[in-house]
C-alpha cells in the first residue's frame, strides 16, 4: 500500500458511519410506530416512556440528517433541487414523520395553510428544517403547536409556534450566528439553527436569500420560529 492509499479520510469515514446510523434509527422509529399502533400505552408511565423514546430517536435521527447535509455542503456535494411544491404537502409530510412523537407526548398540532399555496424550493431540505423545528418544539412545548404558512411581502413564510417558555435570549440575539446559544454544559450546540441558516441561504432569488427569525410571545404564548423563502 502506498502513502496515498494509506491516508485515511476520517471525515468520509465519519460521514459513512453517520449515514448507516441514520438508516438504523429510521428502522427503530418505524418499529416504535408499529409497536405503538399495535399496543397503545396502558398507563401514564408507559406513555412517558414511549414519549422519551420517540423524542430521543427523532432528535438523533434529525441531527444525523443535518450532519450529513452540512458535510455535503462543505464538500460542495449538496445542491438545491428547486421545484414547485404545495407547501401544505411539505408540512403534512413532516407531521406524518413525527406522528408517533406527537401521540406519545399528547401534542395537539394546528395547521394554518391554504391548500393551494405553492412555492419554489427544495422540498427535501426545507422539509428537513421544518422537521427539526417540530422535533425541538415537541420537547419544549406544553401541549400545543401551530404551523402557519403564508405569503408575506413577496416571500413565503413558514412559522412554527408552541406554548412553551420561549427561546433563550442568547438565541434571540443572534439566531443566524454559528455559535448562537451554544452550551456544551447543557448539551446544546444548536446544530439545528446552523443547518436551517445554511439551507435557507441556499435558496435565493436575485439578490434575496432565505433567512429565519426567532421571537417569543407568539400566537400560542411561547416561542415562534419563522422561515422566509424568496
Model-derived regions, located:
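A conserved beta-strand-to-alpha-helix junction within the catalytic ATP-binding
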Residues: 83-96
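Short acidic helix/loop segment immediately C-terminal to the autophosphorylated histidine
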Residues: 32, 36-44
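Glycine-rich ATP-binding loops of the HATPase_c
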Residues: 201-218
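Conserved catalytic submotifs in the C-terminal HATPase_c
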Residues: 83, 108-117
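Short alpha-helical segment of the dimerization/phosphotransfer core of two-component systems
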Residues: 55-63
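Short beta-strand/loop element within the Bergerat-fold HATPase_c
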Residues: 144-154
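Short conserved segment of the HATPase_c
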Residues: 167-180
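Conserved micro-motifs of the catalytic ATP-binding
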Residues: 75-80, 118-121
Amino acid at each position: 500500500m502506498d502513502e496515498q492509499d494509506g491516508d485515511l479520510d476520517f471525515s468520509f469515514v465519519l460521514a459513512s458511519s453517520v449515514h448507516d446510523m441514520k438508516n438504523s434509527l429510521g428502522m427503530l422509529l418505524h418499529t416504535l410506530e408499529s409497536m405503538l399502533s399495535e399496543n397503545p400505552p396502558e398507563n401514564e408511565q408507559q406513555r412517558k416512556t414511549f414519549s422519551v423514546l420517540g423524542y430521543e430517536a427523532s432528535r438523533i435521527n434529525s441531527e444525523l440528517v443535518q450532519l450529513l447535509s452540512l458535510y455535503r455542503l462543505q464538500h460542495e456535494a449538496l445542491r438545491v433541487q428547486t421545484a414547485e411544491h404545495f407547501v401544505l404537502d411539505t408540512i403534512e409530510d413532516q407531521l406524518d414523520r413525527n406522528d408517533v412523537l406527537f401521540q406519545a407526548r399528547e401534542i395537539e398540532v394546528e395547521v394554518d395553510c391554504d391548500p393551494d399555496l405553492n412555492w419554489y424550493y427544495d422540498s427535501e431540505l426545507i422539509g428537513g428544517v421544518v422537521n427539526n423545528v417540530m422535533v425541538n418544539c415537541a420537547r419544549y412545548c406544553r401541549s400545543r403547536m401551530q404551523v402557519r404558512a403564508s405569503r408575506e411581502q413577496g416571500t413565503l413564510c413558514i412559522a412554527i409556534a408552541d406554548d412553551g417558555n420561549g427561546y433563550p435570549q442568547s438565541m434571540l440575539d443572534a439566531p443566524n450566528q454559528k455559535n448562537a446559544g451554544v452550551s456544551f454544559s447543557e448539551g446544546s450546540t444548536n446544530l439545528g439553527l446552523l443547518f436551517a441558516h445554511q439551507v435557507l441561504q441556499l435558496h435565493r432569488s436575485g439578490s434575496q436569500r432565505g433567512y429565519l427569525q426567532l421571537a417569543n410571545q407568539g400566537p400560542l404564548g411561547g416561542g415562534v420560529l419563522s422561515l422566509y423563502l424568496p
